[in-house]
Amino acid sequence: MNKSYSLREIVSTLGGELLGKDDVLISRVASLANAQPGQISFLTDSKYRSVLATTNASAVILTPQNRDITALPRILTDNPYAYFAKVSDLLNPKPEYVAGVDDTAVIAPSAQVPASCTIMAKAVVGANVVLGEHVVVHPGCVIGEGVEIGAHSVLHANVTIYHHCMIGERCNIFSGSVIGGDGFGYAPEEGRWVKIPQVGRVVIEHDVDIGANTTIDRGAIDDTIIHEGCKIDNLVQIGHNCRIGAHSVIAGCVGIAGSAVLGKHCRIGGAAMILGHLEIADGVTVSPGSMITRSLMKAGTYTALMPFQSHDEWLRTAAGIRRLGELAERVKQLEKQLAPQQVSGIQRDK
């Protein structure tokens, strides 16, 4: 059951400026449209002002510029969305794990597992693994030989961490993810493929979240590196030798081919594709569904996707695109034909 906090307690803990009654109790967060008494919401987009006028929320979070748009008790802050996230975290504390090792877990004798760790049923911790304080390993996880995991990190059910990978502190890796499987490396020889041993690691720095069923391949020679603060959604594939810059976010179903390098604070929309060996500058946003086929050396938003149409309209558009080369050639020929006439006309004018 959620614990309730007064607005006064919330502001005392998280900061911000409080207007209105300070003893209002808040037990949950909610959207403006669905909020009920005892719940708090937020407003950042002016198009939802009409919803604010009819909300049943007991309080709202606003920017200082919007301080007078409602009579509801309100907390003023420069970033209402981030403040809302912090309130939600306050009202929904993380579960308290009981330290210890389940009887069905398998722990190698050489593994270093502090007494503060929680190792749940049927987890496997391999030889020479080093776990930090308060690491939580949920049921069915497999941690390979020589893996290091920093303090307060959590592996959810059925996560696999392959040998010698490194996970930083306060990381969350959700169910079904595989860290450090072999990269897709094969050399052609006489019509066959020769497997290239993948001898690098995956190195994940502090404060990284990795969604369910995401795969991050180990490097062929150099390490695959996910820098601090990155947030990666479900069903993402990151190829071998990639480097993802600090505090970048990658939405679901993205594929990043091997040896691509993303800068800091990049935003990659869902189902986007980034080809291998490309470099993406700091601060780049890639729109959902886009295919990036060349390096992007300047911050900004990039889109490589045809907007949707009805099927018949799309067929006509596609047919037109296929004819662009032909049309360009026809225009070029027409320009050549017109050029002598234009010169002749100029001479007559003289």
UniProtKB/Swiss-Prot annotation:
Enzyme Commission designation: 2.3.1.191
Source taxon at top rank: Bacteria
Pfam families xref list: Hexapep (PF00132), LpxD (PF04613)
Broad class of enzyme this protein falls into: transferase
Record's catalysed reaction(s): a UDP-3-O-[(3R)-3-hydroxyacyl]-alpha-D-glucosamine + a (3R)-hydroxyacyl-[ACP] = a UDP-2-N,3-O-bis[(3R)-3-hydroxyacyl]-alpha-D-glucosamine + holo-[ACP] + H(+)
Keyword RNA-binding recorded: no
Pathway the protein takes part in: Bacterial outer membrane biogenesis; LPS lipid A biosynthesis
GO terms of molecular function: N-acyltransferase activity
Role played: Catalyzes the N-acylation of UDP-3-O-acylglucosamine using 3-hydroxyacyl-ACP as the acyl donor. Is involved in the biosynthesis of lipid A, a phosphorylated glycolipid that anchors the lipopolysaccharide to the outer membrane of the cell.
Similarity comment: family membership: Belongs to the transferase hexapeptide repeat family. LpxD subfamily.
Protein name: UDP-3-O-acylglucosamine N-acyltransferase
Native source species: Methylobacillus flagellatus (strain ATCC 51484 / DSM 6875 / VKM B-1610 / KT)
Organismal lineage: Bacteria, Pseudomonadati, Pseudomonadota, Betaproteobacteria, Nitrosomonadales
